[in-house]
Structures are given as C-alpha cells and as structure tokens.
Amino acid sequence: MLLQHPPTAAEAPRFVQLSLQQDLLGGWLLVRETGHIGQRSTVKREQYLKQDEAMAAFEKARDANLRRGFQVMFAQGSEAPR
C-alpha cells in the first residue's frame, strides 16, 4: 500500500509504503519504507510469527498514517479504508 502526504510550500511530498511479506521460515515481515519523493528513503522491518499479528500491525500503521493526513495512492489485495 502506498500512502502519500500532499506537498507543502516548504517541502517535497512525503510517502509511506507498507507491505506484508512471508519469510522463508513461515513468519511474517511488515516492511515500512518512508521518505520524501525524489530523495533517499528509510526502510524498517518488523518480524511477526503469526499472520494475524502482522496484519494487525499493518492496519495500525496504515490508520496512524491516514490520521496524519496521508492519502492512499495505491493499494493491492485489500480494500482501501473509507
């Protein structure tokens, strides 16, 4: 899921990309990539043993970013929040 914050006069637009990935041992990774468009980004990975825990963390991160003014630009495999 790609989220983008509208640009301001002082800075370039920011983005957050969230994804869930299964690792080789059956665990799950929540991958968060954040940064300003056109600049270097930061990637953080959080590991979970169960898919339900990873999905809950994904939804929590998504909701937190939506509250901060980010907008969904692209989502695959799930319905965008209303």
How should each PLM-predicted stretch be described?
Residues 8, 32, 36-39, 48, ...:
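A generic structural signal for ordered alpha-helices
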Residues 1-11, 51:
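Negatively charged, low-complexity tracts enriched in Asp/Glu with abundant Ser/Thr
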Residues 17-44, 59-60:
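Short aromatic-glycine-(Arg/Gly/Cys) micro-motifs in beta-strand/loop hairpins
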Residues 40-42, 49-70:
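A short, charged, amphipathic alpha-helix used as a generic interaction element across diverse proteins
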Residues 64-82:
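Short, mixed-charge low-complexity intrinsically disordered segments
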Residues 11-17:
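Charged, amphipathic alpha-helical segments
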